[in-house]
Structure formats: structure tokens, C-alpha cells
């Protein structure tokens, strides 16, 4: 049956070759069978600018380029790869999506988000997010030498890890009230997002109507894919390959 695939939170980097291997397997064996592929943020562990053309980044860009030649591929930036820009899109052939975006998925309106904006109890992250999403801040960051950007990215990741260790389970998750608000605002019955690394299908009720929230999984222990079929059925699928 015709279907569309959704992934997020691969956190690709040269230091985790197993995740890269799982992604390349996905590209070879799963993606070619789909109508389209959606990547919903934190595809990279860190992205410091489209001009950072390391051998590893070139390898990933070329793999996306091969995919996008034959399959519509959509890319939403996350909090780790928010500096991805139009040059990356041109090099890979992906179509960039704003966060949030409503798409028509087999004639059904579906809200797509990365997901970090839903975690409203994490006040420190929300303040950081408001800052880094300002165009002038991004322009300033991209004007810095690559060597300095690498150091800053490493510093930000270390700060993020320390911050996350101090947070409770509830604070790191989405806020139900914010989920309800955005789904009402966008007038949708299905929300798909990543970020929290807690793959699940949540049944909700909004304005008396049954709705669903699908959370995509991270790739730290293998691949994680949402398979959404033309008939409206869907499944979160995990896979592992022998390395």
C-alpha cells in the first residue's frame, strides 16, 4: 500500500557510525518504497552552517541528494540543526519546512512540529529557543569563523547535557495544555513530532473530538520510523541491523 515515512532525532555525527549505518540502510531498503519522506528535526547532532563541508557532512548531503532525486523529501529544522539553510536545501534537493507546518497527508490535514516548542515547562530551553530563532542571531552566528562556531557548538552541547540531567521527566516532556492549544489553533486531529525521544501514540480528546499525537523515536539504539499508510493506518517501527 502507498505510504509516507517520518523520521527525526537521528543526531548524526561522525562519532556515531552505527547511527549513520542505520540511516544509510533506511535510505537503501525503506525510503525507496515510500511516497515521500519527512525529517522532523535534529537530523544532525549539531549543524554550524551550510559552509561546514566536512567529509562526513558531504557524505550525508550526497545520500540525501540521491534520495531526493527520486522521492519528495521534506526537512524541518530542530533545535540542534536550526542553522540549516537554503544552500543545504539546494545541495540536497530537500524542501525545507517551517516549524510548525500543516500538510495534507492523503487528504488529511496533519500538523508537523519538531517538538521542542511544546516543552513549555523547560523555561531555560524556551528562552534559548527564542534567542536562537531570531534571524539576526543566526546571521551573527554564521558570520563567525568556522573554528569558533565548532567551539561554541561543543560548549552548547555540553551545557545542554548538564541542563537535561537536572530536569525531571515531566519538565523534559511536552506540556499537555500546549499540545491542546496548538492543535486547536491549527484545527487538526493529528500531530506528529519528535524531540522528546519518547516514541508513542497518544489518544487525546480536543473539543470533544478524538485526536492523536504521534511521537517519533530517536536513533541512539537503532532506527525508528513512522509508517503512515494511504488508508490512514500507521505504525511506529523500530529496526536494528547487524554491524
From Swiss-Prot:
Residues where substrate binds: 79-80, 122, 160, 164, 195
Pathway terms, separated by semicolons: Glycolipid biosynthesis; lipid IV(A) biosynthesis; lipid IV(A) from (3R)-3-hydroxytetradecanoyl-[acyl-carrier-protein] and UDP-N-acetyl-alpha-D-glucosamine: step 4/6
Binding site for Mn(2+) 1: 9, 11, 42, 197
Protein EC: 3.6.1.54
Positions contributing to Mn(2+) 2 binding: 42, 79, 114, 195
InterPro entries the record matches: Calcineurin-like_PHP_ApaH (IPR004843), LpxH-like (IPR043461), Metallo-depent_PP-like (IPR029052), UDP-diacylglucosamine_Hdrlase (IPR010138)
Disulfide bridge map: none
Subcellular location per the Swiss-Prot or TrEMBL entry: Cell inner membrane
Entry GO CC: cytoplasm; extrinsic component of plasma membrane
Membrane topology: Peripheral membrane protein
Family, similarity comment: Belongs to the LpxH family.
Name the record gives this protein: UDP-2,3-diacylglucosamine hydrolase
Annotated organism of origin: Coxiella burnetii (strain CbuG_Q212)
